[in-house]
C-alpha cells in the first residue's frame, strides 16, 4: 500500500479554520488547536442565537405595541382581544412598525378594536 502524504489536506483544513477564526483575540485567532475550539463554540452561539433572535424580536414588537396601545387607553392584551373580535389579522411586526411610523393608522386600528370590545 503506498504512503499517503496529507500535507496538502492538512494545510487546507488549517487554513479554513483559521479563516473562520479571523478577528478572534489572542491565540484564538492564530493557533489552530485553540482556533478550532473557538470556531466550534462560535458556531454553537450562532446556532442558538439564530433561534433566540426570533423570540427577542417578538418581545420587542409586543413591548412597542403595548406602549402605543396604552397611549390610546388599551393594554396589549385588551388590544389583541379586540383585534381578534374585529377580525383584523395584522401581525405584530407590522403593528409595531405602524405604531412607530404611522400613529394615525395605528390609532384607527385601536379604535376599531375598542369598538368590538364594547359591543
From Swiss-Prot:
Pfam family, any one: Ribosomal_L20
GO biological process, one term: ribosomal large subunit assembly
GO cellular component annotations of the record: ribonucleoprotein complex; ribosome
GO molecular function, one term: rRNA binding
SUPFAM superfamilies assigned: Ribosomal protein L20 (SSF74731)
InterPro entries per record: Ribosomal_bL20 (IPR005813), RIBOSOMAL_L20_CS (IPR049946), Ribosomal_protein_bL20_C (IPR035566)
Domain of life: Bacteria
Key words, A-Z: Ribonucleoprotein, Ribosomal protein, RNA-binding, rRNA-binding
Record family assignment: Belongs to the bacterial ribosomal protein bL20 family.
Described function: Binds directly to 23S ribosomal RNA and is necessary for the in vitro assembly process of the 50S ribosomal subunit. It is not involved in the protein synthesizing functions of that subunit.
Protein name: Large ribosomal subunit protein bL20
Amino acid at each position: 500500500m503506498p504512503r499517503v502524504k496529507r500535507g496538502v489536506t492538512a494545510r487546507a483544513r488549517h487554513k479554513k479554520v483559521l479563516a473562520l477564526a479571523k478577528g478572534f483575540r489572542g491565540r484564538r485567532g492564530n493557533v489552530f488547536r485553540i482556533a478550532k475550539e473557538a470556531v466550534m463554540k462560535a458556531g454553537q452561539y450562532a446556532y442558538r442565537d439564530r433561534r433566540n433572535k426570533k423570540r427577542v424580536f417578538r418581545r420587542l414588537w409586543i413591548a412597542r405595541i403595548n406602549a402605543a396601545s396604552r397611549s390610546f387607553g388599551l393594554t396589549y392584551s385588551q388590544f389583541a382581544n379586540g383585534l381578534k373580535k374585529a377580525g383584523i389579522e395584522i401581525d405584530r411586526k407590522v403593528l409595531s412598525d405602524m405604531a412607530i411610523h404611522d400613529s394615525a393608522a395605528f390609532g384607527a386600528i385601536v379604535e376599531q378594536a375598542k369598538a368590538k370590545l364594547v359591543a
